[in-house]
Amino acid sequence: MQHTRHNNARKLFSEIDLNPQNYLIIHYSCESFYDIKDGHTPRITSIAVYAYATAQTDSFSIHKVAEKSHIQISDIELHYDELEKKMLDEFFAYAKEHSNFFWIHWNMRDINYGFKAIEHRYSVLGGIPYNIPDEKKIDLARQLINCYGVGYAGHPRMEKLLEQNDIKAKDYLNGSQEAAAFANKEYVKLHM
């Protein structure tokens, strides 16, 4: 069983390497889902999509939408739903335009954190999300486990992988740091 998962993951990594023009890498930042007491879904602050073949990044963020709307960063909270809706309008238009791509992500697989969470949030704000089909989503975290087994890196795995490979991640924030940046209204930090 593990041997089959390992081989399938290796084939997938080879396919990505041979055809990078078919792959996008996505990450997003949101309000902490652990600190919400009233039951609302976490607000999305930014989404970054990196084209693997060209190394170009398209980003969708609250502070950029605020700037285009002539709203000061200090006033974002007063207009958050409106700005978030505009940001997600842009993101879902982009997703629809890139429907033929595969989306590589890290643990974005449920309603708490993932594509479903972004779709739900957009629906709450009155939008109609474009649904990226599950067969177009590649969970890199899961594929690394498939390839190397559960013990390939300690927890938190992303940070441990950075350490193991001596990678200095510029502007990297872990989940709790992202949540703190949101709470402190440091929206630009969440965009990086």
Residue ranges: model-predicted function:
Residues Q2-K116:
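Conserved non-catalytic scaffold segment of RNase H-like nuclease domains
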